[in-house]
Amino acid sequence: MSESQQKNSLQMNNNNNYNNNNNNNNNNNNNNNNNPNNNNNNNNNNNNNNNIKHEITNWSKLQMILEKYIVKNNISSLDKGMDLLLQWFETISKNTDKINTFKSIVGISPDNNSTITGRMSYSTSSIGDLISNNTTDDNKKRILMDVNNNNNNNSNNNNNNNSSSNSGDESTPLFDFRNKRMKVSRLLCHEEMLHNPLNENNNNINNINNNNINNNININNNNNKHHGSDVEENSEGTFDEDENSCPDSFDSNDNNSPEDAYGGSDNESPHIDDDNNVIRSHYGNHHNNNNSSSMRKNNSGTHSTIDLTHIKLPSQMQQHQQIQQQLQMQQHMQQQQLQMQQQQQAQQQAQQQQGGGIGKSPTISGNNSSIAPSPKQLMTIREKMLEYIQKNPSATRPSCIQVVQQPSSKVVWKNRRLDTPFKVKVDLKAASAMAGTNLTTASVITIGIVTDHKGKLQIDSVENFTEAFNGQGLAVFQGLKMTKGTWGKEWNLTFIAVVRPNNASYNNPVIISVSQPFSIVVKTRKNPQIRHNSYSSHILNNNIMSNQNNNNNNNNNNNNNNNNNNQNQNNQNNQNNNNNNQNNNNNNNQNNNGGNMNNNNNGASENSSSSPEVSPTIAPKRGRIPNSAPQMSLSSAPTTTPPSNSTSTTTTTSNGRTFGQDEMASLLWAAEIKQKEQPDGEPETIQGNNNNNNNNNNNNNNNNNNNNNNNNKGNQNYNHGVILNTSKPVTTR
């Protein structure tokens, strides 16, 4: 090397330049003269890096760094830069190990304590050294391109991430940039990483090992070539190592990479501006045991290469072991499922063997879903039934089954069991003769098939349509539950006797006999409540209670009369007592008569089918009293004491509701008119004698307070109260 070149190298080292290269000073000056824009870009980049040195604290801000400080400042064509980033992240996002390798490249050490999974486990790792201690990712790519031009062997060991797009310019449409920006954002924020295949892991291992070997070879070659001075060893050895300092297996390292077409030099040579100020480019620390590396550390401080040997990758043997364990677990689960299926099949075969074929199967009574045919099999049975009917007309049709009991009416209530069930009896001798084999009650079943008038089969109309014969040879059909679509329609129910198959399959059914069709109609009850004589006993209990109330009224009247001796004269008290006794006697007579009338009326309308929702709850329209209104006496007896203290008389019914005089009278009229207008309607419970206690107390108070007036308005005694909420016992069969 010439003296001028050595002086230049010494001058560069004295100026604290940590990125030495093997170019001479003239080349550096040419680079500075030819690429002033690149120098300015690098100056701006380093200034921006210093500004955001303390702002980047987590992995999520990597997107902003890549877009703002790498793409815009160091790549002249923004569209090309986005294409590179997009392809690069599409490659590394498929492999967790590649993501960890990338973190190591940019200065992020993966957390060895955490378990490596298929997710981005290190999303909160610090990347503060990404900008402050490292140059841009494209600088590394540029160096790799220079190295690959000289070393073609290294290009076969790295992954191929070429960009096939042509060289672009600054006039790229904005929407293209935004679309690519969104793609990069998705790749950066996408945490559901795919599981790494074996091939990618093997390629990563080979690439990393080959890169490390090439690094060592290049370093040794450089050390053997240069023995002139320490400066030459440091400068040239450092440059050779810097060429291979970024063995990024995810970037394109072949000669056809479009990075050469990008404007602006991204190499690591020192860029000298107009003021001859040297701009340093920072790199992260690395671990290298080579002599030249240690000498460079003593001289250059922070400048280092990146060694990927500390990255722990799962070995191929471990991966094979994990796959084998998973396969063994799957095989074990499959074997368990096969064993369960075999056990179930063995149990079914044992049950069939215990049955021993037709005539030897166990007796089944009641509804059994296991003997019921499927809808498809039911269609086959119906076809066989039609063939049987065509061959055997009704006049000459032999029959081994007989319907010995059927409902009293053809009405089938909605969601109700039949009031009287169908009972079908089988004649085993006739059935055995028809089937040509000895049959028992357990080997014959009966099926109820519902069809419409046109003979169309209604599969979904009957819930339980298959019954087995009991020991007496009877099959009981009581659970005929009809669906909603059958309400209000008339259907035909036909019973057929079928030989019960051993394998519970009706693909080839043997029909023994077919009964005559029975008409059924599905209706809905307006009032499904069934009334009985307990309602009359309820009225009787009310009358007994009313008589007890009358006796209590007499005692209360006597007590009230005794308490008023201080205010009235003895003669007046005696007269009041006589009047009260007479009132009580009249009340008792009327109460008894009213109770008997109520019993007669309620007993006559006991079987009414109207619902209780039609009871009147409002008073009739005001106006003239109709001619059909009942002649009702609002006073029970002629008393001579008008009211003085009470302004309105109230009446309390048995349900605790209080009515005034006018409202009570209106309710009574409405009840009587409703009964006459609708004789078949819901019987309104006219319960008397429940209000005598309060009414008689009011009457006695009125009689004792004012003894001069003989008006009978104060002694109005209502013996009838309308019970609007009467509890009715509900029984269903």
Swiss-Prot record:
Biased composition (Acidic residues): 231-245
Compositionally biased intervals (Polar residues): 1-12, 246-258, 362-372, 713-733
Biased composition range(s): Low complexity: 13-51, 148-167, 286-300, 542-616, 633-654, 689-712
Region (Disordered): 1-52, 145-174, 219-303, 347-374, 542-658, 676-733
Cysteine disulfide partners in this protein: none
InterPro entries given in the database record: VID_Regulator
Protein name listed in UniProt: Uncharacterized protein DDB_G0271850
